[in-house]
């Protein structure tokens, strides 16, 4: 009795995929390509390990080459049956004849074909006894080509990269970017999620956070699909609402208005008056004309526009810088007259704003003047004098532009200030000695600064050692640096020089005298114009106005004496 015939081994790819030379999915009920193209899916018997042609068939079966195709037709519309119900149909005509052509075996299920290596070859049946060692190509059970790798080469299908979503969930997952984070993770407290107002939580789960969400990875979560949130999670605590913005804007506007109305003077750099007074007190008294009248402007330091050390100027500027008055103990020239200006601190904020708008440019000019004149890098006399001339010109031009066309020359400071600021004096406050004198004091301090700086220049010029200016000795003026100069200036004003070109010392003295006299004349004319514009008629001079005029007259007298001294 012959052993039962084993089912034949079929190809891994169907005929259509094999002809097109594309990868076949390998479903015995019909591959995906044939199902998609609505083609008939047929699988031929595998010829692996067999010699194709009539010689092998003649050697094995002893018959002529068979006619007909060795194929297995599979209808995709047939019903799928289980492995146990898969029957091998034998040909009734040649049921007992093993030498006839192989029987066609229809396979209706993918599990109906065993992929064991023991069944990779088709045994010839009754001719097993005739097989010798020369028929070794028949047994390829251990060959890699004979192994059916259909179970290992499963193609990538849709349900593998869409995880374990249902049909509805898969569409939402592929079309939405807003995956909600796991319910047991609070994104407000978990640093693994971003600090954005809208947390979409599309993050890789790190290995260190296994205590909370180690089982939430899509690759490991098979049974429970990840929930999907169609709307991004919104955290109201991170979003600035309109009411918060409005409240902050209102608060900012209120603070800005308060700052502008009360603290605008903080824009200017301030230096402690006490510290500044100590730094220049020893240096000022080294000059013949640096007496108490020179103390009024000594507080302007290298670009700084801090107020004067005088008590009178300090009280006039106290409404601008809002700092405590700490200079009452300083012994200066105007201490005895400071009680006349006590009422100037009772001005309103409106007057302060207008006066600051009027005097801000003056402080800028004075700051620039002080920075250039006291800078040790200014080694040329022409640079210093040009700076002074431009400062005086700007002050005079600004003063002329502020006066109205219908303003008389005898206009009082109160009327002039009201016309300029376009604000009429209030009846409820005393404007006779208020901040109306602030512009006048600023102009006076600017001219006082220029006067004293020229006084220093004249002192250096007149007290210069004639032995160092002999014809046999090179003049220190022609030296570009001040390191070789025999005379050091502790105040900061450099040794005067006409530049790098050489000039005779006699010509230097003559040019020096002419330039100084001309510039001092400009200062004198500007000071006279200021006094005539601001001050009233001599018969109507009040006590405080008389003090201002007295200071102007002192400056003019000093300028006239300096002009006489520098003339040769």
Swiss-Prot record:
Function comment: Transcription factor that probably regulates the gene clusters that mediates the biosynthesis of botcinin acid and its botcinin derivatives, acetate-derived polyketides that contribute to virulence when combined with the sesquiterpene botrydial. Botcinin acid and its derivatives have been shown to induce chlorosis and necrosis during host plant infection, but also have antifungal activities.
Region ranges (Disordered): 92-114, 207-278, 467-490
Biased composition (Low complexity): 470-490
SMART domains linked to this entry: GAL4
PANTHER family: ZN(II)2CYS6 TRANSCRIPTION FACTOR (EUROFUNG) (PTHR47783:SF1), ZN(II)2CYS6 TRANSCRIPTION FACTOR (EUROFUNG)-RELATED (PTHR47783)
Superkingdom of this protein's organism: Eukaryota
Positions of transmembrane segments: none
DNA-binding region: 14-41
Biased composition annotated in UniProt, kind: Polar residues: 260-274
Keywords tagged on the record: DNA-binding, Metal-binding, Nucleus, Transcription, Transcription regulation, Virulence, Zinc
Protein name: C6 finger domain transcription factor BOA13
Primary localisation category: nucleus
Pfam families from the UniProt entry: Zn_clus
Native source organism of the sequence: Botryotinia fuckeliana (strain B05.10)
Induction of the gene: Expression of the botcinic acid clusters genes BOA1-13 and BOA17 is coregulated by BCG1 during both in vitro and in planta growth.
Subcellular location field: Nucleus
A GO molecular-function annotation: DNA binding
Cellular component terms (Gene Ontology): nucleus
Bias (Basic and acidic residues) ranges: 242-259
């Amino acid at each position: 009795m012959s052993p039962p015939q084993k089912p034949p081994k079929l190809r891994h790819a169907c005929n259509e995929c094999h002809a097109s030379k594309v990868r076949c999915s390998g479903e015995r009920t019909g591959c995906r390509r044939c199902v998609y193209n609505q083609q008939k899916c047929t699988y031929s018997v595998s010829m692996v390990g067999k010699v194709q042609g009539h010689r092998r068939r003649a050697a094995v079966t002893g018959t002529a080459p068979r006619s007909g195709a060795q194929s297995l037709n599979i209808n995709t519309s047939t019903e799928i049956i289980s492995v146990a119900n898969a029957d091998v149909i034998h040909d009734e005509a040649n049921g007992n004849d093993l030498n006839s052509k192989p029987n066609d075996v229809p396979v209706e299920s993918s599990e109906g074909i065993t992929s064991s290596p023991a069944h990779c070859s088709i045994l010839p049946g009754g001719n097993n006894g005739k097989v010798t060692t020369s028929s070794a190509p028949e047994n390829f059970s251990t060959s890699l080509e004979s192994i059916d790798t259909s179970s290992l080469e499963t193609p990538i299908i849709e349900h593998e990269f869409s995880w374990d979503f249902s049909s509805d969930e898969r569409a939402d997952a592929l079309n939405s970017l807003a995956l909600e984070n796991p319910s047991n993770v609070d994104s407000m407290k978990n640093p693994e999620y971003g600090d954005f107002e809208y947390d979409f939580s599309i993050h890789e789960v790190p290995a260190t956070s296994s205590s909370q969400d180690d089982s939430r990875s899509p690759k490991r979560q098979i049974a429970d699909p990840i929930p999907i949130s169609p709307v991004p999670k919104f955290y109201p605590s991170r979003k600035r609402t309109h009411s918060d913005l409005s409240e902050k804007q209102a608060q900012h506007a209120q603070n800005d208005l308060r700052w502008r109305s009360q603290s605008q003077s903080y824009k200017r750099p301030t230096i402690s008056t006490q510290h500044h007074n100590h730094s220049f007190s020893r240096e000022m008294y080294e000059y013949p004309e640096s007496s108490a009248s020179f103390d009024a402007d000594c507080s302007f330091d290298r670009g700084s526009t801090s107020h004067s050390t005088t008590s009178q100027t300090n009280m006039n500027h106290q409404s601008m810088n809002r700092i405590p008055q700490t200079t009452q103990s300083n012994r200066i020239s105007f201490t005895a007259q400071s009680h006349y200006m006590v009422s100037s601190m009772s001005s309103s904020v409106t007057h302060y704003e207008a006066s600051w708008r009027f005097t801000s440019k003056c402080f800028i000019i004075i700051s620039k003047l002080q920075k250039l004149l006291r800078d040790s890098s200014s080694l040329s006399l022409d640079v210093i004098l040009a700076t002074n001339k431009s400062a005086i010109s700007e002050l005079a031009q600004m003063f002329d532009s502020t006066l109205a066309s219908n303003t008389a020359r005898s206009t009082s400071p109160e009327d002039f200030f009201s016309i300029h600021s376009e604000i009429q004096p209030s009846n409820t406050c005393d404007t006779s000695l208020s901040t109306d004198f602030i512009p006048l004091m600023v102009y006076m301090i600017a001219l006082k600064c220029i006067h004293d700086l020229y006084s220093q220049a004249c002192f250096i010029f007149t007290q210069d050692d004639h032995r160092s200016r002999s014809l046999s000795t090179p003049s220190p003026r022609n030296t570009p640096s001040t390191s070789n100069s025999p005379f050091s200036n502790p105040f900061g004003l450099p040794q005067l020089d006409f530049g790098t070109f050489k000039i005779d010392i006699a010509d230097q003295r003559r040019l020096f005298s002419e330039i100084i006299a001309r510039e001092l004349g400009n200062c004198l004319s500007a000071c006279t114009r200021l006094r005539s514009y601001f001050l009233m008629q001599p018969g109507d001079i009040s006590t405080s106005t008389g003090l201002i005029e007295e200071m102007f007259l002192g400056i003019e007298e000093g300028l006239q004496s300096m002009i006489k001294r520098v003339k040769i």
